[in-house]
A protein has these predicted regions:
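GHKL-family ATPase ATP-binding module
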Residues: 1-16, 26, 50, 58-60, ...
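Mature N-terminal segment immediately following signal peptide/propeptide cleavage
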Residues: 17-31
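Conserved short strand/loop->alpha-helix "switch" segment adjacent to the catalytic nucleotide/phosphoryl-transfer site
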Residues: 31-50
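Residues immediately C-terminal
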Residues: 58-59, 86-87, 515-516
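Short conserved segment of the HATPase_c
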Residues: 87-110
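C-terminal interaction appendages of subunits in large macromolecular complexes
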Residues: 395-414, 429-434, 445, 449-451, ...
């Protein structure tokens, strides 16, 4: 735990019921769960764990918690244990009930609202514990505090056992065990890697906090034979986070540049390091919550970075006259983490995608302006390496502009000429239209015949696509495999990307559910992530989910999109006759489906399954692409060996 964060906590304050403030009741959660956890899919299921862990991390931020343990138990129940102070158990004045009961049964009750319990905190608008309780079939909480162990039990938000003392202890902390409610969620299967990724992130963001995650399920879809457990603790905090992001890349400078500062109760820290790639990775957080759409803190960082490097370049003579480098130029090859912790965080959107506090733009900008300038003066070799790369990016940007002009003249793009392979739709309103980017000509043919041509366009991709890992915009523009995608979408790429010119508001990647299909998806996602990021930020990119199985009993036919769904449908079809003959056939590929099958299973808006791609998916794809397509052979070999038998479901 850094000294800056400790300084902003009033650590001497006793944490008791007087700091628990009640704002409103729990009624709405089960009626509209998506409002509180985003969705009732796998994403929402995992969000339950994050909410409980966020409460433990709040204790860490306050300087009281050093170790958090997350256990996936048999039956996909979850236990989260921390060694913090323990949730208060004394009577809360506003309600006359034990504070523990209030925290778990009243929405917006917690130590993060009054300002007395926590100065800074995460959690989805502070609703965590009660929402998890409302959406759990059952939940048990044990609090070790003041020499006693207190226990309370709930079911779907209602008390099944009043708070009582069940023993004595010399420990302190909170232990929560819950089982998600099958009435509320589409799936109950926890994915170890999803939880591991999030917990690793929390460990990086809270230097010195020890987080352990373990999987004690005897059998599960994603579990190898051996026991799974990971313990994470990073004394270097976000410095180590940057090194982790750059682990498969070649840094331009060995030292990670670290900057931090405070204003009142608010703190900000920034860590950055340049590498030899052409991509930019800026990951921002507010109160340990990832802000994938950025916000004021990220804006302040970008503005200061551009200004400082231009000023340094002019001062040292690298930049002549008005030949300034742009924001895109200075961010090429940059990996940066921006983390702020503030008392009154204002997030845009229910899921905290963007930070709205203007004060954070000023704080981060001031810190970077002063401390980065000082670092460059003290480390001129690093300054020169960064400026050389930015100037090279500037020249490449000019080359890309010329390449674009050449391509426009060559392809007639200016006159609106579309790619030969594109089978466009009749409607021209982007809000109503969608384009399927399809793997292979044969699948493209079936899709073209099976589509609804009023609003569905088809673009087949074929052959080997460009490795964008080592490609600048000028190379991308000239690539004959990606050019049709750029032209068909109509919005440009890179710094010229204009969302207003986008011709379709649904861009759907349709590829087989095999290794080749996964490769196509990964490559396209990486391309969109690096050259058309607003497309993903606005939620316009989707992945089609083709079915895996067709089940037939007589004239009745049904399709399944996963093994569990296949088993469920099989049981339903045999409900009246356990010995009924049911034929199960596996779809081998999109190209093997006839147009009618493709329409019914994958393209009909009333029956298809589409998965919206998030920035987190794209970041993961980008990381994997760096390993698989980069020049470093060893990480690629390790990745393939580790995943050959247990293929990780990227859900992309």
């Amino acid at each position: 735990m850094s000294e800056e964060i400790k300084d902003i906590i009033e650590a001497e304050k006793e944490y008791n019921a007087s700091q628990i403030q009640v704002l409103e009741g729990l009624e709405a959660v089960r009626k509209r769960p998506g409002m509180y956890i985003g969705s009732t899919s796998a994403s929402g299921l995992h969000h339950l764990v994050y909410e409980i862990v966020d409460n433990a991390v709040d204790e860490a931020l306050a300087g009281y918690c050093k170790h958090v343990v997350i256990t996936i138990n048999e039956g996909n129940t979850i236990t989260v244990t921390d060694d913090g102070r323990g949730i208060p158990v004394d009577i809360q004045a506003q309600t006359g009930k034990p504070a523990l009961e209030v925290v778990y049964t009243v929405l917006h009750a917690g130590g993060k609202f009054g300002g007395g319990g926590y100065k800074v905190s995460g959690g989805l608008h502070g609703v965590g514990a009660s929402v998890v309780n409302a959406l759990s079939e059952w939940l048990e909480v044990e609090v070790s505090k003041d020499g006693k162990i207190y226990q309370m039990k709930f079911s779907r938000g209602h008390i099944t056992q009043e708070m009582r003392v069940i023993g004595t202890t010399d420990q302190h902390g909170t232990k929560v065990t819950f089982k998600p409610d099958p009435e509320m969620f589409d799936t109950l299967e926890y994915d170890y890697e999803t939880l591991h990724t999030r917990m690793r992130e929390q460990a990086f963001l809270n230097a010195g906090l020890h987080i352990t995650i373990k999987d004690e399920r005897i059998e599960s879809a994603d579990k190898p034979e051996k026991e799974r457990m990971d313990s994470m603790c990073y004394e270097g905090g976000i410095r180590e986070f940057v090194r982790w992001y750059n682990r498969h890349k070649t840094p331009l400078h060995e030292q990670v540049i670290y900057m931090s500062g405070t204003k009142g109760d608010d703190t900000a820290e920034v860590a950055l390091q340049y590498n030899d790639s052409f991509a930019s990775t800026i990951v921002s957080f507010a109160n340990d919550i990832h802000t994938p759409e950025g916000g004021m803190h990220e804006e302040g960082f970008k503005r200061a970075l551009t200004n400082v490097l231009n000023a340094y370049g002019v001062k040292k003579g690298y930049i002549k006259g008005d030949d300034k480098v742009s924001g895109d130029d200075v961010r090429e090859g940059l990996t940066a983490i921006v983390s702020v912790k503030l008392t009154e965080a204002q997030f845009e959107g229910q899921t905290k995608a963007k930070l709205g506090n203007a004060s954070m733009r000023t704080l981060v900008s001031n810190i970077v302006t002063q401390q980065l300038a000082e670092f460059l003066e003290e480390n001129p070799a690093v300054g020169k390496a960064i400026l050389d790369k930015a100037m090279m990016a500037n020249r490449a940007r000019e080359a890309a502009r010329k390449a674009r002009e050449a391509i426009r003249r060559k392809t007639g793009l200016e006159s609106g000429q579309m790619p030969d392979k594109l089978r466009d739709c009749n409607d021209t309103d982007p809000t109503l239209t969608e384009i399927y980017i399809v793997e292979g000509d044969s699948a493209g043919g079936s899709a073209t015949q099976g589509r609804d041509s009023r609003f569905q366009a088809i673009l087949p991709l074929w052959g080997k696509m460009l490795n964008v890992e080592k490609a600048r915009a000028d190379k991308v523009y000239g690539n004959d495999k990606l050019q049709p995608v750029i032209t068909a979408l109509g919005a440009g790429i890179g710094d010229e990307f204009n969302l207003d010119k986008l011709r379709y508001h649904k861009v759907i990647i349709m590829a087989d559910a095999d290794v080749d299909g996964s490769h196509i998806r990964t490559l396209l996602l990486t391309f969109f992530f690096r050259f058309m990021r607003p497309l993903i930020e606005r939620g316009y990119v989707y992945s089609a989910v083709p079915p895996l199985y067709k089940l037939s009993r007589g004239k009745t036919q049904r399709v399944a999109y996963s093994d569990p769904e296949r088993d469920r449908i099989l049981a339903e079809m045999r409900a009246d006759n356990p010995n009924a003959k049911i034929d199960i056939s596996r779809y081998k590929g999109l190209g093997e489906m006839n147009p009618h099958e493709l329409w019914e299973t994958t393209m009909d808006p009333t029956t298809r399954t589409l998965r919206r791609i998030t920035l987190e998916d794209a970041v993961q794809a980008d990381q994997i692409f760096t390993v698989l397509m980069g020049e470093d052979v060893e990480p690629r070999k390790e990745f393939i060996e580790e995943n050959a038998k247990y293929v990780v479901n990227l859900d992309i």
